[in-house]
Amino acid sequence: MARVVRPQKNHVDLDIYQSSYMVDYKPFGKYKYSRVTPQEQAKLDAQLQSKEFYQPKPNPNPKLEEGYPAFRRPYMTALDLGVPGFFPPQERVTTRKDDGRFTTTCHYAYPASLALYLAQQDPYWLHQRADFPCLMEPERQPAPEVGKGYLLLPGCLCDHHQRVKVPILNRWGPLMPFYQ
């Protein structure tokens, strides 16, 4: 009987079991069974507050992923990639005739003639596609080192280009697929 533990001699230190559902725990009675000093308790409270009850504030200057030379400034646009031919020019170029706009090989985005286009399609879509080139054509594709790591989605509805993927750009850099 020499090794019997008497409950009135050894009190249970409930503070070591304290967790988020016991934040408002107060020891009952006039005896506090804690061996934690006030400095340690303040440190533990700060850790608990930072882990479970802290609302993260968004950084006004988000850091971009390293390794991309165009991502040095905090506010980057997709035009900073600077691949020639990947983005349409910003300034308006006057053309001699409307038929001159349809010069590419993708018949979905640019048919052979404007009259055939207006006969087959809604004229509203002409203004949406006239200044944006078909990204499926080889000369419109980005360089392999630039297109690396982007979320690749089909960019053209024609059957010839359904298997090819193009990068969809995000403001803060490439959108990685959820499985990477």
Curated annotation (Swiss-Prot):
Null allele phenotype: Deficeint mice are fertile and have no detectable defects in the testis/body weight ratio, epididymal sperm count, and testicular and epididymal histology.
Query: Is Nucleus set as a keyword in this record?
Result: yes
Subcellular location field: Nucleus; Cytoplasm; Cytoplasm, Cytoskeleton, Flagellum axoneme
The record's Gene Ontology cellular component field reads: axonemal A tubule inner sheath; cytoplasm; nucleus; sperm flagellum
Q: Which InterPro entries match?
A: SPMIP9
Top-level taxonomic group: Eukaryota
Where it mainly occurs, coarsely classed, is: nucleus
GO terms in the biological process aspect are:
flagellated sperm motility
Q: Which UniProt keywords apply?
A: Cell projection, Cilium, Cytoplasm, Cytoskeleton, Flagellum, Nucleus
The free-text tissue note of the record is:
Only detected after the mouse is 35 days old. Expression increases gradually from day 35 to 6 months, and remains stable after 54 days. Exclusively expressed in the epididymis and testis.
Q: What does this protein do?
A: Microtubule inner protein (MIP) part of the dynein-decorated doublet microtubules (DMTs) in flagella axoneme.
Q: Which PANTHER family match?
A: TESTIS-EXPRESSED SEQUENCE 37 PROTEIN (PTHR36882:SF1)
Q: How does it assemble?
A: Microtubule inner protein component of sperm flagellar doublet microtubules.
Q: What name appears for this protein in its UniProt entry?
A: Protein SPMIP9
**What's the source species for this entry?**
Mus musculus (Mouse)
What would be the name of the gene that encodes this protein?
Spmip9
